[in-house]
Amino acid sequence: VHKKRMTQPMKMTAYEKHDWAEIDLDALRNNFRAVKARAGEMPLCAVVKADSYGHGAVECAKVFAEEGAAWLAVSCLAEARQLRKAGLTLPILILGHVEPSRAPVLIQEDITAACYSLPQARALSEAACAVGGKVKVHLKADTGMGRIGFALRTDFDAALAEMLDACRLPGLDVPGL
């Protein structure tokens, strides 16, 4: 039996040139199938940020798409665009910050941004309206780490009100939280 493997050179210092990462794409496929079987009908988002943690985002994303992932997630717009350029059509969620000025690209390439605050939501909405479109966003709630997101943990009522305000903005389409 021939196993399909993908070897990805890693960016290393001169002292670490002997290291590499090798991914068995069949094992990745089988692992995803196992998770999907446990999840039942729950849609799964495959996180392929940071080049799938150095293992080849495009190759890994193609496996996840073939196996029925509902979404792909990346850390930045450049990673999302790389997946689109490779022909991946699944919804893509950017987990990191996206500048509102990039709204036209998000709209054109059907890429979803994470939205962390009402000011960010307003800025994205304004930028989208300026080009006659809507940006898809998932609202990010801070549920405990205290780092980023609508502050549900510290002021639930105020954060919920802000999230609802974001959902009503004319330049946003909010398919998720």
What are these regions (language model features)?
Residues 1-9:
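Short, Lys/Arg-enriched N-terminal segments with co-localized hydrophobic residues
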